[in-house]
């Protein structure tokens, strides 16, 4: 008699994806972040659903509805902070997941990689719109500054901005549509994640060596389900520690003041996970140039597979590429720090140098290092 999980049409799909899935036996903890992202998405959808039950997307009541959630709703403060810090957790896992893909050469699965870039863009759009919803000072001014960047697009820029705003400034119409998109996008992200998994299971997972591991694979369950369960436990511990001990650690104090179009904060900045891109945007004096650099800072990931010219897939045996990779990580951390600083000397020049290095390492230095490593292997 065939087991029901191998026979039932629906169970068969789940079985082939999470139970009997042939998995390389040597994948490390860096491969856990994909499942962490799934858990983060589930947390965000659930907490977001409960928040949406009490939130009102109207400029006059949005701020007070968030206050009401925290003060009057049963465990509303916990749901709100789980959602806000869950977004930070989401981005930590997302950056580590992309970083692992770059280090171990997972970008050679082009379809999976491109869907991943789409997912990254969708998550960033969702997080940006979510930041606007509490209608605090930084919500309002962040929305004004970031949406206003679209006016740099030639010919249609100004019309496009007014179309997105639904008027001549960020107001009620903007907040309502941002709430609608913020609600629907996580479900689109969930659908994209399924497509991401579909393409991944077509090729099979990569492994730290970057070598084909078809001859040495083990079932996903129980080996990796237990490993993921431990990861979920540690992730939950970290998230709950953040929520229960320092819920406002990653937020902005300005967002505890209601939005006031007549009072500009001294330093407008987005959430910490956008600061690297914001620093790249600010490092270019020209508005259009800054917007192009901002978009390219994410879309540059799409051309990484075409710049790969190394004989070895993974960086595990490529010391020169490893040095450049960690220089890139250091550059991104520097950009994140600079994005949170005021626009003055010496932060301007540090941001410009870090931005140049970011593009230089990915576009020129890494392919050159790979070429040199290929030559050294033959030497």
Swiss-Prot record:
It comes from the Eukaryota. It is a multi-pass membrane protein. Coiled coil: none annotated. One of its GO terms (biological process) is mitochondrial electron transport, ubiquinol to cytochrome c. Its cofactor is heme b. Heme b b562 binds at residues 83, 182. Its main location: mitochondrion. GO terms for cellular component: mitochondrial inner membrane; respiratory chain complex III. The chain crosses the membrane at residues 33-53, 77-98, 113-133, 178-198, 226-246, 288-308, 320-340, 347-367. One of its GO terms (molecular function) is ubiquinol-cytochrome-c reductase activity. SUPFAM superfamilies: a domain/subunit of cytochrome bc1 complex (Ubiquinol-cytochrome c reductase) (SSF81648), Transmembrane di-heme cytochromes (SSF81342). It is found in: Mitochondrion inner membrane. Heme b b566 binds at residues 97, 196. A ubiquinone binds at residue 201. Keywords: Electron transport, Heme, Iron, Membrane, Metal-binding, Mitochondrion, Mitochondrion inner membrane, Respiratory chain, Transmembrane, Transmembrane helix, Transport, Ubiquinone. Binds 2 heme b groups non-covalently. It holds the Pfam family Cytochrom_B_C. Belongs to the cytochrome b family. Component of the ubiquinol-cytochrome c reductase complex (complex III or cytochrome b-c1 complex) that is part of the mitochondrial respiratory chain. The b-c1 complex mediates electron transfer from ubiquinol to cytochrome c. Contributes to the generation of a proton gradient across the mitochondrial membrane that is then used for ATP synthesis. Heme 1 (or BL or b562) is low-potential and absorbs at about 562 nm, and heme 2 (or BH or b566) is high-potential and absorbs at about 566 nm. The cytochrome bc1 complex contains 11 subunits: 3 respiratory subunits (MT-CYB, CYC1 and UQCRFS1), 2 core proteins (UQCRC1 and UQCRC2) and 6 low-molecular weight proteins (UQCRH/QCR6, UQCRB/QCR7, UQCRQ/QCR8, UQCR10/QCR9, UQCR11/QCR10 and a cleavage product of UQCRFS1). This cytochrome bc1 complex then forms a dimer. This is Cytochrome b. The gene is MT-CYB.
């Amino acid at each position: 008699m065939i087991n029901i999980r191998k026979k039932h049409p629906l169970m068969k799909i789940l079985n082939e994806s999470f139970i009997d899935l042939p998995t390389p036996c040597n994948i490390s903890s860096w491969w856990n972040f994909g499942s962490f992202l799934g858990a983060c998405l589930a947390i965000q959808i659930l907490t977001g659903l409960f928040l949406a039950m009490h939130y009102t997307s109207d400029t006059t009541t949005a701020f007070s509805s968030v206050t009401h959630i925290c003060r009057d709703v049963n465990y509303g403060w916990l749901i709100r902070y789980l959602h806000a810090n869950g977004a930070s957790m989401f981005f930590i896992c997302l950056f580590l997941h992309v970083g692992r893909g770059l280090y171990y050469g997972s970008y050679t699965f082009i379809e999976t990689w491109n869907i991943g870039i789409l997912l990254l863009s969708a998550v960033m759009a969702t997080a940006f719109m979510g930041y606007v919803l509490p209608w605090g000072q930084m919500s309002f001014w962040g929305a004004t500054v970031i949406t206003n960047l679209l006016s740099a697009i030639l010919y249609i820029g100004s019309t496009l901005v007014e179309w997105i705003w639904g008027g001549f400034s960020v107001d009620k119409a903007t907040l309502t549509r941002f709430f609608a998109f913020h609600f629907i996008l996580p479900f689109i992200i969930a659908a994209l994640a399924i497509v991401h998994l579909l393409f991944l299971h077509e090729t099979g997972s990569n492994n730290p060596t970057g070598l084909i591991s078809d001859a040495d694979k083990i079932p996903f369950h129980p080996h990796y389900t237990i490993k993921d369960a431990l990861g979920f436990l540690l992730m939950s511990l970290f998230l709950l520690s953040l929520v229960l001990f320092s819920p406002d650690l990653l937020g902005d104090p300005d967002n505890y003041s209601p939005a006031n179009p007549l009072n500009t904060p001294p330093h407008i900045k987005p959430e910490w996970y956008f600061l690297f891109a914001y620093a790249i945007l600010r490092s270019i004096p020209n508005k259009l140039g800054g917007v192009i650099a901002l978009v390219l800072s994410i879309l540059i990931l799409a051309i990484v597979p075409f710049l790969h010219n190394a004989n070895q897939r993974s960086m595990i045996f490529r010391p020169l590429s490893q040095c450049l990779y960690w220089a890139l990580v250091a550059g991104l951390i520097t950009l994140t720090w600079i994005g949170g600083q005021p626009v003055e000397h010496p932060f301007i020049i540090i941001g410009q140098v870090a931005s140049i290095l970011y593009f230089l390492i990915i576009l020129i230095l890494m392919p050159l290092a790979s070429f040199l490593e290929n030559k050294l292997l033959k030497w």
